[in-house]
Amino acid sequence: MSDLQASTAAGQRGPADHSIRDQIIEAADEHFSRYGYGKTTVADLAKTIGFSKAYIYKFFESKQAIGEAICARCLGTVTTAVRESLAQGKSATDKLRRLLKTIAVSTTEIAFNDQKIYEIAAYSCAEKWASSTNYLEEISGIIADIITEGRASGEFERKTPIDEAVRAIMLAFQPFMNPVMLQYNLEAVPEGVNEVTGLILRSLAP
């Protein structure tokens, strides 16, 4: 199980594969999409789904736990898109370009297609939910692997400690991967993404 998959269990109760759990998540996803995460209570969800609050609490310990499950699923679509794109990469340089572009485009699509669900992603980043922190750890791990590959092939410099290089790349790309920051940088996609990517690659050059 990946870190991102593990994060979906945060605050959940009962069998992980229980159909009722999925039903609650689906209904909550739809409700949050319509009314927003911040304005919704567990009582609202219970009324919408037709369950009692007590029954929902058998599967989730809080509204945040439900939000975590939705957020993890949402961020999971981003990492899936990233890995599918990386599978087509021809070099470490190409893979890093693909990684950063896919993250920016996928996150932007979420922002445009479902603003209310995007709100949950923003909550997760601002409040450092497990679904968000594990997502960032997974992306950091992918970047570390790409840097290692690039150093082995002679594409990237070898002086900077890998963990330092990864942190720097993650910090530089925050405006396009952090939902809280991206909402203020939507007009910079894709030109700004390409410029930041170019700057990152030049810093990695031997």
Residue ranges and their predicted role:
Residues 69, 73, 82-109, 162, ...:
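Hydrophobic alpha-helical connector segments
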Residues 23, 27, 31-65, 69:
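Helix-turn-helix
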Residues 85, 114-121, 180-183:
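Secondary-structure edge/capping motif, primarily at the C-terminal ends of alpha-helices
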Residues 1-19:
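N-terminal intrinsically disordered/low-complexity leader segments
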Residues 76-79, 126-153, 163-167, 191:
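Amphipathic alpha-helical packing segments from all-alpha helical-bundle domains
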Residues 3, 105-109, 140, 144-145, ...:
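Amphipathic C-terminal alpha-helical segment
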Residues 102-144:
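Short secondary-structure transition hinges
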Residues 34-38, 88-89, 110, 153:
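Short coil/turn segments at alpha/beta junctions that flank glycine-rich nucleotide-binding fingerprints
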